[in-house]
Amino acid sequence: CCDIIIISNYCLKKGYVYMLINSLAALALGFALDMLLGDPEVVVYPQYFIKKLVAKLDKSFRNSYKNNPEAQRMAGLMMTVIVLLIVAAVALLLLFVGYKLNAALGLFLEGIMCWSALSVKSLKTAAGGVMRAARAGNLSSAQRKVKKVTFRDTDDMNIDAVIKSTVESVAENTTDWAVAPIFWSAIFGGLGGILYRTVNIIDNTVGSKTDTYINFGK
């Protein structure tokens, strides 16, 4: 009996170590793809699909209950759950089929998911673009570029305000676009990374305290 318990514990530990190594390998692949390609606006890129899904369900749910604040709050919760279930189901199906067919294919698909969870290159590129425009004294260009890293109204900002907003937004987004996705991807692999980024996308879409989302985004 003791031997069975020892063997079972050994197998569990070995399985966990294998899963952790696999997650780290997928994360390394995803990070390399992110630094190489950034966030392309193409249909096959998971983040693009998630944004389109959130935008479509957001409009549908919000318009259906726009005259009832309580119903809007419930609709926002329902939309979040539905999006997460869809993303989780698609991700799990792809991983199951991928690893079933070939370990390398499964690892590649998991790496794609980790890639979609990260936006390190996009953050670096966007912030660099703002700073170059600000140094050149091109206010309109700096205002336009800073919108890629912040959801604030930038139309009335001067150069100093644009630079300050960029620094603050980079500090905030470093956690959302780099540190947190790396953490969840390292522990739970591509599934953990892509689900975290899905929550982040939903929050960025409906979480603002504007008149439009004051109830729906709660």
Protein language model regions, located:
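Short, Lys/Arg-enriched N-terminal segments with co-localized hydrophobic residues
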Residues: 1-18
